Design a protein with these regions (language model features):
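A short glycine-rich, Lys/Arg-flanked "PGG" loop and its adjoining helix->strand segment in the class I
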Residues: 137-152
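Short alpha-helix
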Residues: 180-196
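Class I SAM-dependent methyltransferase SAM/SAH-binding core
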Residues: 56, 62-113
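A short acidic, Gly/Pro-enriched loop at the edge of an enzyme's catalytic core
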Residues: 112-123
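Conserved alpha-helix/loop element of class I SAM-dependent methyltransferases that forms part
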Residues: 33-51
Length: 268
């Protein structure tokens, strides 16, 4: 596991309460994860998310994943947990706009200690967001606590690839992204297994090196004005952000960072 011990929850909250969060939504859409709807559909299919099920989205952000599951998988109810009040306020507004308020519940809490009752959910869901969590072992423990016996943990995340980053590369990447740490597929698998879960086909989706050029094209070719407006027309900052994204692309092409996908079943 690579770590950036100077990064904490308050730093992540600052990102998603300010211009950086709006910039990510500009580039990636409401579904702020690599692959958008295609990625969500793929994860839901692999996890066999059931119609009529009850799920919890840990690090739900704007609630787009919850609304996807309500609309495309016809789940009965989704709970969403996030520690950033700004994004939860927007999530509630968007749930109301899509007419699903009665089928969602939002909880402001640390995802490592949600306060939700144990054994209450058919599945736990996450999309490219657990990389922001400081204590990933506690996150996995909380995820499995929330599940009924036989329940499913299904998530994608930004992970370290099969070729490790150097210490210098990891520090630069984690600092730019405000990730306190980054796990590999093997590390997530080990944590799930130690929490009595059977892990099914952990894999690299292969999307990372294909999608970062798309985001770069949008910020450098099409949405440049929009991006500059979000960051107060600070062209020096825009250049720095572009440079860090090109660096991130080089890591993805080298297999050092990936979008990993994991589906696991709680024993019992």
């Amino acid at each position: 596991m690579k770590t950036a011990p100077e990064i904490h929850l308050r730093d992540v909250q600052a990102v998603y309460s300010g211009p950086e969060g709006r910039l990510w939504e500009l580039l990636m859409g409401e579904q702020i994860h690599i692959g958008g709807l295609q990625s969500s559909m793929d994860l839901a299919e692999r996890a066999c998310i059931p119609a009529g099920g009850r799920g919890v989205d840990l690090c739900c952000c704007l609630g787009a994943g919850m609304r996807f599951l309500l609309r495309f998988r016809n789940v009965a109810h989704m709970s969403g947990v996030d520690a950033t009040p700004t994004v939860l306020a927007l999530a509630r507004e968007r749930a109301e706009a899509e007419g699903v308020t009665s089928r969602v519940t939002f909880v402001e809490a640390n995802v490592c200690a949600t306060g939700l009752p144990g054994g209450s959910f058919d599945f736990v869901w996450g999309e490219d967001a657990w990389c922001y969590v400081e204590d990933k072992p506690k996150l996995i423990s909380e995820s499995t606590r929330l599940l009924k016996a036989g329940g499913i943990v299904a998530f994608t995340d930004w992970m370290e690839g099969s070729t490790p980053m150097t210490a210098e590369e990891a520090k630069r990447f984690l600092t730019f992204m405000k990730f306190p740490s980054i796990f590999s597929l093997a590390e997530y698998t080990a944590q799930l297994q130690s929490n009595h879960c059977e892990v099914r086909a952990p894999q690299d989706t292969g999307r990372f090196p294909k999608y970062v050029p798309l985001y770069l094209d949008m910020i450098e070719r099409q949405l440049t004005y929009d991006a500059l407006k979000i960051i107060g027309f600070d062209q020096a900052l825009a250049g720095a952000l572009s440079g860090e994204m090109h660096f991130m692309q080089s890591l993805a092409e080298a297999g050092k960072i990936i979008q990993g996908l994991i589906v696991a079943r709680k024993n019992g």
